């Protein structure tokens, strides 16, 4: 079938190969001199006959007298249509840059968050300016100013932030670092806090089914964090942070060039909190004491003349946490009933490599190879519960990019391999498993830039536990009129549920753990399978002479099979495969507007309908608000000529509707909760004073409304009793927190 497809595409070029036209497509350099534009699309209007300009901008194209209109296009330039009357006369044509094809921006000058009008996938690009609107000490804190991601604490003990997208928790989101899956398996619970915010250059958030190139596991979407590149980062960067809760952080970047083609970067992170806090006076720490050391060494090789670029990254992490009752002493009270306490010690090592080659003579052909290995070891206990996990992971992906006929028709194809070894110790039981998979993928993209994009992909995988399966995904973008983009997508995802690693908050309870099932291949359970469908509409506008845009998103996730995490019996947590329906519906509308120069406003409303058929009946997913309102305002003063100093002001407001509590009706009356939580409203703000390109200071506050959950731990007065549970967290625990910091860099 594929061979027939190639023949059909190439046949018109063969038929009309008797006559040809030739020419050169150009752009202007910095001196306004003409230079050849490589990779430009040149094709006959309303045909499949076309080509791409070579490295010098030249082209040759089949001609027939019935062909009159020649279309020339390139991303970032105005598409031109020429009338060809004399095929014997070489064509020399300049393409002009245009603002009409740029990404839509939500700030007037330098966009901090952007959506593209041109891409088939619904991708939100977040750059470093957006990340600097909040302290963003680590990746889990980098979404406070983005309405597409929900952030809340997983429990009242560990201080772990949990993210959600489209109403689903992070295990259903593929979280990658430079397009290599990184937050998965053993790192699912705490991994977002293992990536310091200053290391992140930009974040790409993809809603709905992602690309088949990145694997088969994503269901709700993908989050990719691009790290700083040694060749572009400052030679020296220092970020110092301190907060009123006595949290201290230091980040240092050291970058240097080694010859003309090698660059190296050393990134150091240290953070600590060694003070006990109990604002709600329940005798439990509101946040854990911890120490973290994080070291990253990156090597970059760039040879643009020959088309080579490669990265090698080595990372080591040591993270220790202690939490529990105020009088808990791990030296004397560990795993006893003297006092309830917990320690979580994590050591992680990662090495990854990326190799890319672009043929200098054929720039539309490229080869990329990604490899990564990680070793993750966590030793922990929660009161009398023990949980240890060792996870070794290997990942490899090879990607070949090319075109068919002309650059409107692009293909990606390749092979991937993954290996995971898990060894988990839960109280007295040992759980082990090996997972390995090999897969092949093919993705076709059609792009005529201004009107229509289509990306269709399929991958076939063989997995030793999940079997053989196919993963199809499709994305379409259509622009019916100016400054508009209508998108639709669907795709399938399949994954193994890591029931313990992904739900570590269960250990900070007195619940009995039950796995109901024995016929599945993953601890007796079957894999999770879901389909995601989505539609999105983006429209730009001008109001009172100022730019803005409005977006409407609707996504639906239907589970064919799911590992249900059932909290409805307050003395148990039950894991079993779905019998019935489980779905997540998400609607979001977002408005970005620039009312006046240097001031940007973003507002969003989000509605969730997330329900599952539990053994006790269909219920809404616990602790998932149906309604959320979000607003962010940012302003920066104008840069005056000859001066580098300016002020920046940012404020973010979040309102969460009521959230359903899992049932506590079987508890004694004194340990019962209402059916729903109160609503929550929080305000974060930050002021930054930029003195120069080298130095700036910032001052901010989180939860300035001082909202706090007074009794987040059920049964805190009897932590070893049958009703102890720290998972009923619907909002902030600590109350207001203020911080200050500085940034210093030498370019």
Residue ranges and their predicted role:
Residues 494, 655-664, 688-747:
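C-terminal beta-signal and adjacent terminal beta-strands/loops
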Residues 273-294, 300-367, 373-391:
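Flexible loop and strand-edge segments within Gram-negative outer membrane beta-barrel domains
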Residues 26-33, 38-45, 73-77, 87-132, ...:
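Short, acidic, small-residue-rich periplasmic hinge/interaction motif at the N-terminus
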Residues 140-181:
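Extracytoplasmic beta-strand/coil segments of soluble accessory domains associated
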Residues 366-380, 479, 487, 523-577, ...:
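Membrane-embedded beta-barrel scaffold of Gram-negative outer-membrane proteins
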Residues 88-94, 139-142, 161-164, 190-196, ...:
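N-terminal periplasmic accessory domains that precede
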Residues 59-62, 180-207, 295:
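Short acidic/polar hinge/loop motifs at secondary-structure boundaries
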Residues 554-558, 577-662:
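Gram-negative outer-membrane beta-barrel transporters
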């Amino acid at each position: 079938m594929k061979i027939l497809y190639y023949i059909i595409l190439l046949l018109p070029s063969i038929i009309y190969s008797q006559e040809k036209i030739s020419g050169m497509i150009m752009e202007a350099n910095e001196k306004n001199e003409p230079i050849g534009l490589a990779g430009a699309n040149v094709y006959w209007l309303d045909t499949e006959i076309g080509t791409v300009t070579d490295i010098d901008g030249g082209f040759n194209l089949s001609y027939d007298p019935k062909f009159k209109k020649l279309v020339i296009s390139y991303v970032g330039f105005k598409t031109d249509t020429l009338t060809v009357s004399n095929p014997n006369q070489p064509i020399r044509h300049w393409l002009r840059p245009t603002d009409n094809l740029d990404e839509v921006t939500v700030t007037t000058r330098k966009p901090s968050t952007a959506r593209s009008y041109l891409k088939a996938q619904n991708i939100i690009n977040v750059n470093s300016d957006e990340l600097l609107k909040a302290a963003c000490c680590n990746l889990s804190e980098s979404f406070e100013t983005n309405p597409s991601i929900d952030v809340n604490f997983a429990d009242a003990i560990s201080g772990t932030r949990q993210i959600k997208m489209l109403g689903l928790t992070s295990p259903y989101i593929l979280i990658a670092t430079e397009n290599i899956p990184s937050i998965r398996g053993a790192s699912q619970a705490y991994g977002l806090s293992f990536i310091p915010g200053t290391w992140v250059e930009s974040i790409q958030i993809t809603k709905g089914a992602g690309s088949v190139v990145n694997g088969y596991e994503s269901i709700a979407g993908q989050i990719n964090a691009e790290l700083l590149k040694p060749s572009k980062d400052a030679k020296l960067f220092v970020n110092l942070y301190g907060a009123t809760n006595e949290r201290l952080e230091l980040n240092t970047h050291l970058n240097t060039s080694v010859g003309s083609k090698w660059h190296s970067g050393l990134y150091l992170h240290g953070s600590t909190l060694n003070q006990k806090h109990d604002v709600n006076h329940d005798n439990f720490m509101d946040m854990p004491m911890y120490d973290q050391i994080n070291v990253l060494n990156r090597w970059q090789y760039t040879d643009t003349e020959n088309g080579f670029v490669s990265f090698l990254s080595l990372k080591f992490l040591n993270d220790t946490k202690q939490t529990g009752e105020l009088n808990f002493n791990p030296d004397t009270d560990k795993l006893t009933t003297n006092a309830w306490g917990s320690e979580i010690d994590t050591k992680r090592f990662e090495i990854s490599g990326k190799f890319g080659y672009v043929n200098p003579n054929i720039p539309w052909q490229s080869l990329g190879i990604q490899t990564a290995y990680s070793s993750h070891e966590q030793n922990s206990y929660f009161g009398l519960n023990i949980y240890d996990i060792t996870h070794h992971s290997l990942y490899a992906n090879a990607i070949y990019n090319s075109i068919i006929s002309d650059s409107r028709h692009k293909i990606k194809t390749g092979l991937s391999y993954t290996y995971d070894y898990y060894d988990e110790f839960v109280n007295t039981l040992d759980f082990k498993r090996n997972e390995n998979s090999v897969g092949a993928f093919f993705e076709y993209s059609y792009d005529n830039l201004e009107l229509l994009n289509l990306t269709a992909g399929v991958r076939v995988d063989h997995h030793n536990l999940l079997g053989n399966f196919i993963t199809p995904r499709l994305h379409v973008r259509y622009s019916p009129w100016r400054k508009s983009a209508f998108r639709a997508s669907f795709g399938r995802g399949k994954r193994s549920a890591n029931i313990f690693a992904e739900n570590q908050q269960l250990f900070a309870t007195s619940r009995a753990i039950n796995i109901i099932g024995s016929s599945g291949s993953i601890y007796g359970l079957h894999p999770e399978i879901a389909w995601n469908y989505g539609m999105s509409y983006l429209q730009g506008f001008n109001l009172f002479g100022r730019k803005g845009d409005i977006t409407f998103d609707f996504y639906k996730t239907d589970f064919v099979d799911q590992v249900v995490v059932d909290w409805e019996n307050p003395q148990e947590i039950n894991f079993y495969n779905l019998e019935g329906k489980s779905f997540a519906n998400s609607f979001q509308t977002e408005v970005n507007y620039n009312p006046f120069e240097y001031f940007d406003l973003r507002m969003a409303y989000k509605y969730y309908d997330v329900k599952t058929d539990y053994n006790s009946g269909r219920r809404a997913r616990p602790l998932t608000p149906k309604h959320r309102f979000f607003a962010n305002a940012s302003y920066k003063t104008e840069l005056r000529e000859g001066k580098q100093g300016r002020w920046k002001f940012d404020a973010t407001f979040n309102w969460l509707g009521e959230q359903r509590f899992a049932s506590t009706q079987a508890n004694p009356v004194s340990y019962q909760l209402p059916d729903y939580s109160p609503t929550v409203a929080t305000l974060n703000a930050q002021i930054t004073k930029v003195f120069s390109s080298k130095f700036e200071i910032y001052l901010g506050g989180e939860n300035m409304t001082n909202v706090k959950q007074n009794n987040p731990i059920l049964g805190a007065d009897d932590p070893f009793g049958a009703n102890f549970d720290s998972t009923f967290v619907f909002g902030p625990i600590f109350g207001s927190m203020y911080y200050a910091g500085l940034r210093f860099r030498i370019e």
